[in-house]
């Protein structure tokens, strides 16, 4: 049985420890998860061997923790999802693609800061 793990980030809401998940997407679940999301989704197209991808990962964890009620954070491993990589024209990693209502609304290629990402996410809400 193929189970996809998701990274759990601890979040304190109302004094209770809860979790905001960073969703792992692949070719089998991408379209459904993107189209059914009631909130915008920031998808990180990354590679495990990519230094800048590893550098932006803690930033995405922070955003998931702080903004988890208004946005979802997801990751796609480009080496394991070549059809998605081709479909969205991913040529460099990290590439961050912003979705709302199942449609691409914005994209950032390369390493960027938390403030820029939050600003872009706010334009989607």
Language-model segments: which ranges?
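Conserved residues in the N-terminal Rossmann fold of short-chain dehydrogenase/reductase
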Residues: 75
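Proteins that catalyze or organize thiol-disulfide redox chemistry
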Residues: 1-42, 47-72, 80-83, 87, ...
